[in-house]
Amino acid sequence: MKVILASASQRRQELLIRLCDEFDIMVSDFDEEKVVFKNSIDEYVQNIALGKAMDIKEKLKEDAIIISADTIVTLDDKILGKPKDEEDAFNMIKLLQGRSHKVYSGVVVINTKKDLILKNSVATEVVFSKMNDNEIRKYIETKEPLDKAGAYGIQGIGGIFVEEIRGCYYNVVGLPLNKLKTMLEEAI
C-alpha cells in the first residue's frame, strides 16, 4: 500500500527514509491555528497532526498509509512554535538558553483501507547551555532557526548549544522514529 508523508519538512522526509523505502509527499493545507489548546500539550500536538492527516485523507482517491506529525517546544508551560521573524527567534533562544525545556511531537498514522487512526505523542527534555547575545545573533544569521519550533535545529548548528537531552533525539528533530515504527507496525 502507498505511504504518504503529510509534510513539507525536509527533516521529516530524511528521517522517514530510515523506516520506508518508498513514500510520497503531500503537503497539507490544514490551518494549525484552528486547533485550540485546552488542557494537554500531548493532546494539542496530536490534534494538529490529526488535522494535517485528515486533510490529506480527504484529498486521496486511493487507499494509503498517511503519516503526519507536529512538533512544538515548551518552556514553563508556554508554547514556542516557529519564530515569526529574527527578533522572535532571538527572544525564543534567549528564553531557552541556560535552561531545560521540552519538545513534544504529535504523530498520527492513518490506514485508509482499515479506516484505522492511530495517535500518539512523545516528549523529550532538552537542556540548553548558556549563550550570550552575540552567540545568539550569530546563530540567527545562519537562518537555521527561522523555520523550526523553538528557533533551533538540534541536527544542525543549533546542536552545539544542547548540553543534554533526555528522551528521543529524533523527536527533537521532528519525527520520533521509534514511536512511529511501532505505530506503522500496528497500522499495517
Curated annotation (Swiss-Prot):
InterPro entries, from UniProt? ITPase-like_fam, Maf-like
Q: What is its EC number?
A: 3.6.1.9
**Keyword rRNA-binding part of the UniProt annotation:** no
Lineage of the organism: Bacteria, Bacillati, Bacillota, Clostridia, Eubacteriales
Cofactor (UniProt): a divalent metal cation
Task: Name a biological process GO annotation.
Answer: nucleotide metabolic process
Please give an example of a GO cellular component term from this record. Answer: cytoplasm
Pfam families reported for this sequence: Maf
Q: Any idea what this protein is called? A: dTTP/UTP pyrophosphatase
Tell me where on the tree of life, at the top rank, the source sits: Bacteria
PANTHER family on file: BIFUNCTIONAL DTTP/UTP PYROPHOSPHATASE/METHYLTRANSFERASE PROTEIN-RELATED, BIFUNCTIONAL DTTP_UTP PYROPHOSPHATASE_METHYLTRANSFERASE PROTEIN-RELATED
Q: Which residues form the active site?
A: D70 (proton acceptor)
Q: Which UniProt keywords are listed?
A: Cytoplasm, Hydrolase, Nucleotide metabolism
Q: Name one GO molecular function term.
A: UTP diphosphatase activity
Q: Write out the function statement from the record.
A: Nucleoside triphosphate pyrophosphatase that hydrolyzes dTTP and UTP. May have a dual role in cell division arrest and in preventing the incorporation of modified nucleotides into cellular nucleic acids.
